[in-house]
């Protein structure tokens, strides 16, 4: 594992390529009366939880109250009303809360309308949710011509240095890079002390793995019997929150966890949290649902710890597949790939294209490179069909975006398409990435809450703080 330290200031082009500029956003509402900005999913969650609490009070069920600091200033809000709800409504609310992270902006707006949710501080319904990008934007340099952002994660710096990291590792796979540093997110509603802040410390590992062979991990046997408490996406989509405690080998075998490498890191995360003193009865691994999945993730699990604020996401473990390396390679032209020497050469039969460069350039003039790139990008099945039409008609037509009407005709004197054999001594592939991401502040907060308590002194008048925090 290679440690890297990357800059916090990131050019906008990097984050545009990675998808963060367009997709790294939360849904927010605005109170038209006092101008308060509200995060939409938190608003829906708080309103429904308040109504369920009022229902329990109306039914005579004891509700545990979280102790509040009397010195802390709080916004004036209406007290919870003890109103008994119909059993069907209670079930609806519970199902919504179970999959609250899966709703998009339009669906959150529909929930607010349907259940007549109003801001408790003003009694007014907030505006429809709109997307709000969570990155802090700035300008780089005195001319301010280069836009940039404070990094929302440390991962992009690691991906940009992939080629150097691979060289440092003597071109050997698999390997990993790691980075510890500050990340910055312009949270809509920071709250709960260290749990939701705009500047925080995180530690991320990017483990690069060969996708061929099902993403096996050579040390999976060491952790296969570690039992994890899992809340999968199917359970959440059914509006339920019951969990299953299963050994990680079984979760991988039945497809709940996608592959061995992802399973290996989930088990290692569990063992780490156990070692530092996290209460094992207050930990679960929750799988992301489709709508809450990050734009770069193929699968993702969160290690959530239970606190007085509820279940808090403290560690994320995502299968980023080959997304990041692929998009950065496409944008920059840099080959972010691994070349592996084959033990035995292999013979490949394929359709190959030859262009007459002396005629091709003058014929297409300024569009020559664009057309050539489109031709080279043609898949094998398309090449086979075009070879047939070229032989039959003496010309072919291909789609080329940005040239004329999007259709380009190429005659047989400019192009040859033939089926040939070639021998390969090396294999090229883009590695997949498994990423464990640790929120240091959240882990420390949960650790203190899990290990710190007070007990009465001999006199009975004073309380003494006791901590069972471990030092690994």
Which residues make up each language-model segment?
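TRNA-recognition modules of translation machinery and tRNA-sensing kinases, especially anticodon-binding
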Residues: 1-472
